[in-house]
């Protein structure tokens, strides 16, 4: 999916919501545990209920890898289900990969060739040669970690060099030498507030993947005020606040209702 297609889908749905599939078998409704594949059964129901209100899904690989082979199978089935039934949805593999060139090339092959996923999150710490293998696939996206929503982001990302440039700003500037706004996005946590204003001075045209709305307390209004650009430029993720909004047999219906609430907020902002 290219940038124009993504923007057109945002306009059509009046939404830039991404539903995070951080599926924990300890948190899904008990009645699903009787299913042959409880994780996939949960994901399928969530996807069917939320698809009208979102433009992307973001399975977090850690939740699937922690279950070994069964978890990876559930992940593959989830990706296939989205692609077959909701082909307009942008799929993000939240894997946070990043290693030396040969290893990164294998990661890229996994997500872009074997699974044909639209995008993957990548850690930039090891530099250009750890990122470029992901950039060799036409129509695929790298989503580079820039300024995250966790408290530990202060440990490194907000530290300044002798010129007063913060590390996340250096990541933004340097990585523009490797790619452009047609194949690279950045992760910026919703809890970072006014930092979006500084980020847009460096990357005015790139899409930003924004986790931290909902359970982590980020403000959608603040993110949009400082982060939105002429093509929207935002994919705002919500995971727990949607997928775990209810633990009864009505969990999917409630998840759909929560996604619809967020979509309505987004539509209001887009129409201002």
UniProtKB/Swiss-Prot annotation:
Pathway(s) served: Pyrimidine metabolism; UMP biosynthesis via de novo pathway; UMP from orotate: step 2/2
Coiled coil: none
PANTHER family: OROTIDINE 5'-PHOSPHATE DECARBOXYLASE
Gene Ontology biological process: 'de novo' pyrimidine nucleobase biosynthetic process; 'de novo' UMP biosynthetic process
SUPFAM superfamilies in the cross-refs: Ribulose-phoshate binding barrel
Similarity field: Belongs to the OMP decarboxylase family. Type 2 subfamily.
Name of the protein in its database record: Orotidine 5'-phosphate decarboxylase
The enzyme's E.C. designation: 4.1.1.23
Keyword Amino-acid biosynthesis in annotation: no
Record key words, sorted: Decarboxylase, Lyase, Pyrimidine biosynthesis
Species the sequence originates in: Phocaeicola vulgatus (strain ATCC 8482 / DSM 1447 / JCM 5826 / CCUG 4940 / NBRC 14291 / NCTC 11154) (Bacteroides vulgatus)
Reaction(s) catalysed by this chain's protein: orotidine 5'-phosphate + H(+) = UMP + CO2
Family annotation (InterPro entries): Aldolase_TIM, OMPdecase_type-2, OMPdeCOase_dom, RibuloseP-bd_barrel
SMART domains xrefs: OMPdecase (SM00934)
Enzyme class: lyase
Any one GO MF annotation of this record: orotidine-5'-phosphate decarboxylase activity
Presence of the UniProt keyword Lyase in the record: yes
Superkingdom assignment: Bacteria
NCBIfam families (UniProt xref): pyrF_sub2
Active site: 96 (proton donor)
């Amino acid at each position: 999916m290219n940038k124009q297609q993504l923007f057109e889908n945002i306009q059509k749905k009046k939404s830039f919501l991404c539903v995070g599939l951080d599926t924990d078998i300890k948190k899904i409704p008990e009645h699903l545990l009787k299913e042959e594949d409880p994780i996939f059964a949960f994901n399928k129901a969530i996807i069917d209920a939320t698809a009208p209100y979102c433009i992307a899904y973001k399975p977090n690989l850690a939740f699937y890898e922690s279950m070994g082979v069964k978890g990876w199978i559930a992940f593959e089935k989830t990706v296939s289900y989205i692609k077959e039934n909701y082909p307009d949805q942008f799929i993000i593999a939240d894997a946070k990969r990043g290693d030396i060139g040969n290893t990164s090339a294998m990661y890229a092959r996994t997500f872009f060739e074997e699974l044909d996923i639209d995008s993957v999150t990548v850690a930039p710490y090891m530099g250009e040669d750890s990122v470029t293998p992901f950039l060799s696939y036409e129509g695929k996206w790298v989503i580079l970690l820039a300024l995250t929503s966790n408290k530990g982001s202060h440990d490194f990302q907000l530290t300044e060099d002798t010129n007063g440039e913060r590390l996340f700003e250096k990541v933004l500037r340097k990585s523009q030498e490797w790619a452009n706004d047609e194949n690279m996005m950045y992760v910026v946590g919703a809890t970072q507030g006014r930092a979006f204003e500084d980020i847009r001075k460096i990357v005015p045209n790139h899409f930003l993947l924004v986790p931290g709305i909902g359970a982590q307390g980020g403000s959608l209004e603040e993110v949009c005020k400082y982060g939105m650009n002429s093509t929207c430029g935002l994919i705002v993720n919500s995971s727990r606040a949607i997928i775990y909004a209810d633990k009864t047999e009505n969990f999917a219906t409630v998840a759909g209702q929560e996604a619809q609430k967020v979509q309505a907020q987004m539509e209001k902002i887009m129409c201002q």
